Amino acid sequence: MFENLCALQLDSDLFAQAIHPEEPIVAVGLASGHVQTYRLPPGASDDSDPDEALAAEKGFGHIATTWKTRRHKGSCRTLAFSVDGSSLYSAGTDGIVKVADTTTGRVTAKFAVPLDLANGGIDAPTLVHALSPQSLILGTDSSALHIYDIRDQGAKSAFKPQATHRPHDDYVSSLTPLPPTEASTSGFSKQWVTTGGSTLAVTDLRRGVMVRSEDQEEELLSSVMVTGLSKKGTSVGEKVLVGGGNGVLTLWERGVWDDQDERITIDRSKGGGESLDVIALLPDGVGPGGKIAAVGLGDGSLRFVKLGPNKIIDELKHDELRQEGVIGLGFDVTGRMVSGGGKKLNIWGEKTWQDVPEDDEDEQEEEAPANGKREHESDEDEDSDEDMEESSEDDEPKQKRKKRRKGKGGKQAKGHGILHFSGLA
């Protein structure tokens, strides 16, 4: 279904990944505190030069580092683009949230994460999410969920929480907005689902925590919303998929939040399944059709589940050599899949060779490099953060956050590599 187009080597372990909503741009946050953005080659769905798009489709494109800087003291834990993609939010173990211009990387605003009420220390962030042009949500280790009104970032009160909720007893591990109802006048979500510990909760922008599920007796780590499913019986055709720490994907019917509706086993490794750390839904027009979820596992596997039959239809490996968990997973505006984990970022495209005549396929194989793909090393000469409103260059490196590591599990899929990007050293 997908083949590896390019592998980019990172300078430090990946802790966060974000994909631009309107342009082929990927941002990464690293254990070293660095934040870096890459611009991918244009795709068929871009409005760019058709010749460039054709070159990228044939495997001849260039991935450019737009900017790179040490943004945080310690590690960068989470990243998120604004709704229109003009700003990039980052938050680190230094207890600071910074807002940067996506194009230049220059910091335009910053504010401190509220301290942990239990000990008065830094309450490290776990996620940041731009719900709308008006609202920003920040989750922390202490289970706090802070809501900010960011319409006027110049106001002194702009970066003080308008409200704080605690939907879980443990840290907030994932957040998924619920689609706005037909009665919505803004077109933006005002409710969202979060996971934390062994519970799922629904929170409303104005009314706070509305419902919390029963204890699922398993760790809930990731989530994604799926719409357009079959409406049978009382089903509204909308479900939230939740990835668990034991290799099971659970489905939750919208509006029925007390308990899960269905279960799909993704991994059956001995000693308990691998954790399902991240989930992304294939965009319309990508893949063989139907609703398909891509799931990133703690052992570095990528598995694809077709909803309805609820069956695994394909499997890939983020890294053939190392068993690093998949930390980031998503699709850019052109439909390419981006997976991140360890010190590696992979760009995947849909397989194209199935529809190529045998003669043409032979010619392509002769022209392809022997190893099928090339590694892209990070640029060591990128600008530092000296020209920005930063003071983190003088800090000593902090200890990296411990990452979840489990035993080997699952069958490794053979790597693809018929396409590649040229010019990547």
Swiss-Prot record:
Tell me where it resides: Nucleus, Nucleolus
Per the record, the gene is JIP5
Enumerate the UniProt keywords alphabetically: Nucleus, Repeat, WD repeat
UniProt xrefs under SMART domains? WD40
Coiled-coil annotated spans: none
- Mind telling me which GO cellular component terms the entry cites? nucleolus
Q: What is this organism's lineage?
A: Eukaryota, Fungi, Dikarya, Ascomycota, Pezizomycotina
Name the UniProt record assigns to this protein: WD repeat-containing protein JIP5
In which residue ranges is the amino acid composition biased (Acidic residues)?
Answer: 356-368, 378-396
